[in-house]
């Protein structure tokens, strides 16, 4: 997530302030640099459903909105631990990086991803206008709300491909 935000920011996309941290001390420093009373602390793993996940140490949730004074405690419970989500499988994924992000007041939350699709053996844009917290559940209950656009490796993303996303 933090790598994607960095790439988008480099291309002029407005993204919330976020700082990656690989230690508790770095997490505390990141929260101080953000400078707000509250921050969002997010486990960085290659699996979705982090907010609803459970760490093998019993700690609940891989994404939290917390007071800056709680960063040391939460980072200590998350870093170096294994997070189990619906997408990770029962073995889970180790958390070696956290993203500390500025808390935003959301007016509208959307989901957008580019993933490798097994069916088409290529990249696929996945988008939804109804947020991304439980995208898997939404896809199961209302699949018509999920927009899927296959990307040709030869052509890349064209203007025509983006029309369904508007």
Model-derived features with residue positions:
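Active-site nucleotide/adenylate-binding loops and adjacent lid/helix of ATP-dependent enzymes
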Residues: 1-166
